[in-house]
Amino acid sequence: MSVSAEDFLKVSRVLRHSDSEPWWRVAASRAYYASYHCSRIWERQLPKSGDDQGRRGVHESLIARLLNPDGACRAELASRSRRIGEHLAQQRTLRVKADYKIDHDVSARMLVRQLELAELVFSDCAGKGVGVGPSSRRRRPGGIAKR
């Protein structure tokens, strides 16, 4: 069984209604990974990858490439890439807090912000231009969409 970026986002939306911090932390983390996978898929459709600025980690590298799009990208596409990179960077900061800084509080408000950022990433990835972001419906053999 495989999952999609949208599946992670759906889990986050459900957990948003939980009444305890551990679940908010899980939801914040999954929302980031939803955006990460959505962004990674979207980036593959660009004419050429951006400059990773020598970053080594896969997360930092993706964010850097999105923030520094290649000149082969037309202006609107480059602008969208930078927006996605900015939102993903903000989400990563919140995800690190949720996953690793257990001595810091994670609030429902922080989770709401994380979900807002995820919605912005998904919206930009689905915008006009370089195709669309990951489909919310996976294709089964024979081309029938799975709902």
What are these regions (language model features)?
Residues 1-147:
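Terminal alpha-helical segments
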